[in-house]
Structure formats: C-alpha cells, structure tokens
From Swiss-Prot:
InterPro entries the UniProt entry points to: F-box-like_dom_sf, F-box_dom, Kelch-typ_b-propeller, Kelch_1
Protein name as catalogued: F-box/kelch-repeat protein OR23
The keyword Repeat is annotated on this UniProt entry: yes
Membrane-spanning segments: none
Signal peptide per UniProt: none
Kelch repeats: from-to residues: 93-139, 145-200, 204-257, 269-328, 330-377, 390-437
Length: 442
C-alpha cells in the first residue's frame, strides 16, 4: 500500500533543501545581534568599560571568547575608550615598547609588554619604491598614535647613488584605525635629530637639529641647526628659533616647570643634549666628530617668545668622550638617566653633573650593542644574550635569528634590580646600534 503524500511536508523539505543549497553558494557576512550584552546581567556601557581595563597585549587572546567580545575588541571604540576614560591618569594604560628593528617599510615594527613579556607585530609602513635603507629616523608616541619622522636613506633618483640623503617624510600609525597615515612633511629634511612630543589638548611635536648621516658610514654627513614644531590638529609645521649652533646625533626631552605646571604650554622646557657639530681629522686622513658636552634649553611659551639658553659642560675632559644613551623617568618630576657601559648615571640638574646611581647587576658583553629605555617608571637595560657578533657581516647577521633578550630593570625609587628573559619573534638579528625604539601607553 503506497504511503500518503503530504504536500506541506514536501514543501518544507524542498524549501529547506533549497535553503541549504543557497547557503552553500551564498555565505553572507556574519552579523552580530546588537541586543546581545557583552557581560550577562550588565548593560553594554558597563561591559565595555570593564573590558577596556584588560591589558592591551591580552586583548587578542580573549577576542575568541564570544562573538560580541570579538566585535567590540576589534572595533575603534576600544582604543578611544581606553584613552578617554581618564585623561588625567595614564597609569591605567599598558606601557608598551615599540621596536623598529630595521626600515619599517621592509621589516615590521613590534610592540613589547615588559609585564607579560608578550609581543605583537604591527603592519609595514607604506613603501616608497625609490627610497631604501631608511635609518636614523625618530619614533615618538602621542596619544594612541606612533609617529615616524625623518631619517636618512638612499634615493635611486639622486646622483651619486651611494650618497645618503635626509628625508622630511612623516608617517603616523593609528591604533584606533590600525592603519598608517602620511602626514605633512617637515620643512627641512633631517635624520639623527632631537625630538619630543607635547601632550595636551593641542598635541604638538618639536624637532631640532639633525643631519644626513647614514648608519653605514661612521663619519661625514651634514649638520643643521633648524627647529620646527608640528601641530597635530592642523597638520602643519612652523619654524622656530634655531639652535645656537649646528648639532646632529642629539636627543631631546620635554621638562615641565613645577611652578607653572597648571599652565599647559608655558611651564615647559625643551632640552637638547649631546650630539656632534664640527669634525677634525686624525693624521689628516681619518675624520673624527667633535662631540658636545653641554645641553641647550628652550623655554616654550604661548606668546611665541621661545629663547634658547646654553647649559655648560656636564662632565670633565677625562670622564667620557661623548654622551651615552639617555632616558627620562617621572619620579615626581622628570629625572634624566644615562647608561655608560655598566653604570647607570643620574643627572643632577642643580649641579649640572652626572653622578653614579647604580651598576648593572650582571656585566654585559659590551662588544654587543645594548638597548636602554624607560617603562613603567623603571630603567630597562636590554642585552641580546646570543647570536650576535660585531665581526659578522651585515648579510650574516640578517641570516641569523634573534637570540634571547635579557632585560635588567632598575627601580629608581626603590633602588632595586630585577631581571627577566624574553624570546623576540624577529626572524633576523636585533642590532641596538640601529634599532629605533619609543614607548606608548595603550
């Protein structure tokens, strides 16, 4: 006896089969129901605030918890919320190190968290097909952005081809949009210059000095004394009073005057330390730089009355030939520290002298380059343990993988040291002589 036929069931079956066939050919983009809450029992506003306190390097790990978390943690709202929840206190943000091992247009930069020892790569910077070998650029952070300014590179359109030229290009990486942006170039091309970011309601960046020297050459290159200031909102550069003399290879810091700290712009000073100006020759053949032992300071004022004052020599004739690597730490007020071989020196501003603060607990092999940065109020001495030799050629170093990274951390308030070891994710050697680093809070 034949089975009865039910049209409704056939219709349902056919519709389901056609639906499945359509879904196999057309895969619409997954949409998340906006009515779903991030955390059950709490409003989305509260849930977003709670998730915004997660340390930045851990965000990629918790994205896969659920669809709503993935949508929020991948959105532009996250970074904006982390920076806007308390503008007066940035200690709640993760203090990270941004490392540029090589030319950022051919080798990606990385973010490093010294607390969790986690690494995260960033996209490549836009490439110019005519320019290669960018080095001696400056990276500085301002808000949720990292700026890459200037540098020295080779240009295939110039002659002779083996002469490096300074560049005036400026790029900015936005952690909100996760993209690189090209900004207005500097008025004067420069590399190896002093630079400092001025946070506030109207963010600004100031640059001073510089030249055209490339890392492939130990001497030669131009020097300059020009000073410029960049307005972030207007995307414009303006000329400021020049340095008292030519100065390249220098470093810059922003210092706030405690008496006028409530005045956003007027209580600031721009310090430019070290560097070199003229040169001399040994036996009439070998060029040798003449390094400066002093510093110059500019008082930054709204009325445009910027003036430079010269600070005398910071050390004697027989102490050291040139300034070492310098960082600034906020110990209630900015304090300068310098790494001089295996010693940490503190700058006594009243005496205008560098005094010994502490020694690195484990002596580094000083035939290797050493990194020196300030993070979370601590000094970080970064030493590559293995896989590096100064006698290796440039090609050989690029073929080898990076070794382990020993980081000695010094707390200036507690006068204590601690050490950690991390494995960098680079597929090439890390050379601290040419590596560019800056810190950022996210």
């Amino acid at each position: 006896m034949p089975l009865p036929i039910f049209p409704s069931r056939l219709q349902c079956s056919s519709s389901s089969s056609s639906s499945s066939s359509r879904s196999s050919f057309f895969r619409p983009k997954l949409r998340i129901d906006p009515s779903l809450t991030l955390i059950p029992g709490l409003s989305n506003d509260v849930g977003r605030l709670i998730l915004s306190f997660v340390p930045y390097p851990h965000i990629s790990r918790i994205k896969s918890t659920c669809k709503s978390w993935y949508a929020f943690l991948s959105s532009k709202t996250l970074i904006s919320l982390r920076h806007s929840r308390d503008n007066s206190n940035t200690n709640n943000l993760s203090h990270l190190l941004c490392i540029f091992p090589q030319d950022p247009s051919i080798s990606p930069p990385f973010l490093f968290d010294p607390v969790t020892l986690s690494w995260r790569s960033l996209p490549l910077m836009p490439c110019n097909p005519h320019v290669y070998g960018l080095c001696n650029f400056v990276a500085v952070a301002l808000g949720p952005y990292v700026y890459v300014l200037g540098g020295s590179a080779f240009d295939t359109r110039s002659y002779p081809l083996d002469v490096p030229l300074p560049t005036s290009s400026v790029f900015r990486y936005s952690f909100v949009k996760s993209v690189w942006e090209r900004l207005s170039p500097m008025m004067s091309p420069r590399g190896s210059f002093a630079c400092a970011a001025m946070p506030g309601s109207c963010g600004r960046i100031i640059v001073a000095g510089g030249g055209s020297r490339h890392t492939l050459f130990g001497a030669a290159g131009s020097r300059m004394s020009s000073v410029e200031m960049y307005d972030v909102e207007k995307d414009e550069w303006r000329v400021m009073n020049e340095l008292p003399r030519f100065r390249a290879g220098c470093v810059g810091f922003l210092v706030e005057n405690e008496k006028e700290k409530e005045k956003e712009e007027e209580g600031r000073e721009f310090w430019v330390m070290g560097g070199y100006g003229g040169s001399r020759t040994v036996s009439g053949i070998l060029p040798v730089d003449e390094y400066y032992k002093d510093a110059v300071v500019m008082d930054l004022r709204v009325d445009g009355g910027e003036k430079w004052r010269v600070v005398g020599d910071m050390w004697g004739e027989e102490e050291r030939p040139k300034l070492g690597k310098i960082v600034a730490v906020d110990c209630g007020k900015p304090v300068f520290f310098m790494l001089d071989k295996d010693w940490i020196l503190r700058y006594e501003m009243g005496l205008n002298r560098w005094r010994k603060e502490s020694s690195v607990p484990k002596k580094a092999h000083y035939d290797k380059p050493v990194g020196f940065v300030a993070l979370n109020g601590e000094l970080h001495v970064m030493i590559l343990l293995d896989g590096y030799n100064l006698m290796d050629t440039r090609h050989t170093r690029q073929q080898r993988k990076a070794g382990s990274l020993m980081i000695h951390m010094y707390d200036p308030k507690k006068k204590t040291w601690r050490s950690v070891v991390s494995k960098p994710p680079f597929n090439h050697q890390l050379d601290f002589r040419t590596t560019v680093m800056c810190t950022i809070r996210l």
